[in-house]
Structures are given as C-alpha cells and as structure tokens.
C-alpha cells in the first residue's frame, strides 16, 4: 500500500518536473549571435570606427574595421560610431631570487619574461540621435620573452603589442555585436 502511494507520487512529481522544465525552456531566448535572421552582420557592417591616437590605438582601430565589415573597410553611410581610446604598458615579470640563479647574479644572457597589458575604453553611439548604446572598458595581456639584445627586445615588445591589439579588437567587436544583436 505504501509503495503504491509512493509510486503514484513519484509519477506525479516526474510529470510536474517535465512540465516545469518545458515551460522554462520555452522561455529561453538563445539564438545565434551572427545568424542569418538576427541582422547582426549588417549592423556591424554599418559601424564606423573613429580615428584614435598612437601606434597601438591604430592597430586596434585597423583590426576593428577589418572585423566589423569582413574586410570591406569603413561603411559609406554609418548608422553607428565607435570611439576607442587605447593605452598600453610593457613590463618585465622577472622574479629576483636569492639563490644566485637570477640574471644579475650569474650573468644569465637568455630571455626573461615580460608582459604587455593593453586597455581599451570604447563608446558606441547611434549616429541618428547621438544616443550612447554601450560604453565599456576591456583589457588584455600578452606574454612576451624579452631577449638581452636591445633591438630584439623592442621587436618582441612590438609583436606582443600587435597580438594584444588584435585580441582587444576581437573582444570589443564581440561586445558590440552582442549590444547590436539585442
């Protein structure tokens, strides 16, 4: 008798949970960000990227222009505008040990670790009314091996800045696509 009551209640509970889960999943708004029906690609192609200062800022801007329109360049008539402000810093992450294994203590002449931290603040506005749609700050870090030779160190730092600029542009583009896809 008790097992019949338990069996009946377990079937009722299972049915209720199935109906509840179906209701929750029906309200789910998951859709592809770059899908055909979303129109996000067309909106991204209508975004112009304003001029920015500095070499790394120009790298981010060039990559954003390429990513927004799929290599087609700036739009002739932009519906949206994005202003990007980029800053970058390169530092050594060398750790000083006291067991005579550091570069300074044993004439180590190999590369030592470093990193480039790049931050970008951007503002996305609608051209027609000047409304700010999104304003955010993103940052990325690129690791780098810094050799002892000065020119090689400059080149390695520049390569790390270029990698960080490409990554920052992709993050900003994804963020803008999510904003325009709403």
Give each language-model segment a name:
Residues 128, 152-182:
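C-terminal/domain-edge helix-coil "capping" segments
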Residues 29-32:
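Bacterial signal peptide processing site
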Residues 23-27:
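C-terminal motif of bacterial Sec signal peptides marking the signal peptidase cleavage site
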């Amino acid at each position: 008798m008790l097992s019949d009551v338990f069996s009946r209640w377990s079937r009722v509970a299972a049915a209720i949970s199935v109906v509840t889960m179906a209701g929750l999943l029906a309200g789910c708004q998951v859709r592809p960000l770059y899908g055909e029906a979303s129109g996000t690609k067309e909106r991204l192609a209508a975004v112009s990227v304003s001029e920015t200062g500095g070499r790394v800022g120009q790298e981010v801007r060039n990559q954003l222009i390429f990513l927004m329109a799929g290599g087609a360049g700036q739009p002739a008539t932009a519906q949206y505008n994005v202003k990007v402000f980029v800053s970058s810093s390169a530092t050594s992450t060398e750790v000083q040990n006291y067991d005579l294994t550091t570069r300074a203590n044993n004439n180590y002449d190999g590369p030592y670790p470093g990193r480039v931290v790049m931050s970008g603040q951007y503002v996305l506005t609608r051209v027609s009314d000047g409304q700010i749609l999104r304003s955010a700050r993103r940052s990325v870090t690129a690791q780098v091996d810094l050799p002892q030779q000065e020119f090689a160190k400059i080149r390695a730092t520049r390569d790390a800045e270029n990698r960080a600029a490409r990554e920052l542009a992709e993050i900003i583009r994804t963020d803008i696509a999510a904003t325009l896809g709403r």
